[in-house]
UniProtKB/Swiss-Prot annotation:
Phylogenetic lineage: Bacteria, Bacillati, Actinomycetota, Actinomycetes, Mycobacteriales
EC number of this enzyme: 4.1.3.40
Any one Gene Ontology molecular-function term assigned to this protein's record: chorismate lyase activity
Keyword check for Lyase: yes
Protein name listed in UniProt: Chorismate pyruvate-lyase
Length: 210
């Protein structure tokens, strides 16, 4: 199946907690702590340093250097419930050394690290859609998850350049309500609008061609 961008009206039909998470412009982990009513822990599934940036529109024609690719899970510390899966591409050569060290040596959430650094950043409006979960979840043993999730993608800008591209997948099954069934029955488009003037096509995992 492909992915379909959600309109504002369709987003309003999501469960209240899911709407809060999708709309938050702050640190997702902090908000999820409140929504889930428990401490949230970060489980880094995969982290690797790429010498060459992937060929995606968000990074096109930019001399950005090395990329840190990070795939994580956000889970309840006590319950073990998986709430969110996330993928990030981080342009580490455009960030202060201290941030790079925290990213590579600790399990702290990216949002927490960036907030603590106090560097000036701007988060672009996120694009929200319903679509498939990333394929790497199955690769690491998560076979029994729902096939569809609410996803969002955004870029974080610092110094006039994108330094982080994050894609988050919210597991609908862990929230009380779900969007109306017609959301999954509508005509799908696998074009994703980044709201930065770029459009690109998703095929399975967002960064499958890395």
């Amino acid at each position: 199946m492909t992915n379909r961008t959600l309109s504002r009206e369709e987003i309003r039909k999501l469960d209240r907690d899911l709407r809060i998470l999708v709309a938050t412009n702050g640190t997702l982990t902090r908000v999820l702590n409140v929504v889930a009513n428990e401490e949230i822990v970060v489980d880094i599934i995969n982290q690797q340093l790429l010498d060459v940036a992937p060929k995606i529109p968000e990074l096109e024609n930019l001399k950005i250097g090395r990329i840190l690719q990070r795939d994580i899970l956000l889970k309840g510390q006590k319950s073990g419930i998986l709430f969110v899966a996330a993928e990030s591409l981080i342009v580490i050569d455009l960030l202060p050394t201290a941030i790079t060290t925290y990213l590579t040596k600790t399990h702290h959430p990216i949002g927490e690290i960036m907030a603590a650094s106090r560097i000036e950043t701007y988060k672009e409006d996120a694009q929200v859609w319903i679509g498939d979960l990333p394929c790497w979840l199955a690769d690491y043993g998560y076979w029994d998850l729902p096939k569809r999730a609410v996803g969002r993608r955004y870029r974080i800008i610092a110094g006039g350049q994108p330094v982080i591209i994050t894609t988050e997948y919210f597991l609908r099954s862990v929230f009380q309500d779900t969007p109306r069934e017609e959301l999954d029955r509508c005509q799908y488009s696998n074009d994703i609008d980044t709201r930065s003037g770029d459009r690109f096509v998703l095929h399975g995992r967002v960064f499958k061609n890395l």
